[in-house]
Amino acid sequence: DAMWEDENEFCKESIFESNQLPEGKSWGNAWSGYGTNLPAFISPADLKDPDGIFKGGWGFGPVRQAAYDMYEQGDKRRDGSINKWDDGLYTPRFQNTGLFQRKYAARVGYNPPPGDVDLNYCNNLRIFRYAETLLNYVELVKMHGQSEVDGVNAQACLDQIRERAGVSPIQPTEENIKLERRREFLGEGMRFWDLVRWGDAPTLLTENEPAHNSVRTFEEWMKYLPIPQGEMEKTKGTEFELKQNGNWK
């Protein structure tokens, strides 16, 4: 959890970050400064934190109970990734579960004036972490058949991740590798791309869950971006004529 605090930006576990600076951004001047509004998006509305650490936001992107439950007993990443707020401490919004993302949550003192406070948080976005290096290596070796490099053992890499989280070692099976990435990177924007890369998106991103007001379908062709119409027009009638990806219109 400490890695996501302001004083630990650019620490040894964080290889590359997008630096966010609260420099007076406002609704009328969105290009002023480099503050981020992500903390406002994902924090519960009208939050009253008894400990005075976290602030309220707009209440988007609540965490599902299944994500909270996927962590093993004693896994420090659960409470470092998810805030669980009691009823009465915030105003429920769409798809409310009482669970919210913690890593980039709105924190007291992270959005000083001037400018609009919701647009000026200084939470740096961690783009690439050491943990991703380890789990990428494990996946390449165990799921994609690549040879180990310079004697670096895939099991040992996975053990590093698990030891830091305070849980026992597990075997680097495909199922375990996928689950470990989900646990490690919750709330960091990795999950969608992992599912697409593994070919799991059509299954796991297609659902009909009235409890979450979620009805959606994901098909294989959707992993490709649509080609802009203007670009296709430029090549029309040539030997290099562009054709639209999938069923994009």
Describe each PLM feature range:
Residues 13, 63-130:
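Flexible, polar/acidic helix-loop-strand segments at domain edges
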Residues 3-53, 120, 125, 162, ...:
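Long, intrinsically disordered, low-complexity segments
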Residues 16, 75, 79, 124-161, ...:
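Extended, hydrophobic/aromatic-rich amphipathic alpha-helical segments that build helical scaffolds
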Residues 86, 146, 203:
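Surface-exposed, flexible loop/turn segments at secondary-structure boundaries
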Residues 42-58, 62-69, 76:
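Active-site rim segments in enzyme catalytic domains, especially the processed small/beta chain
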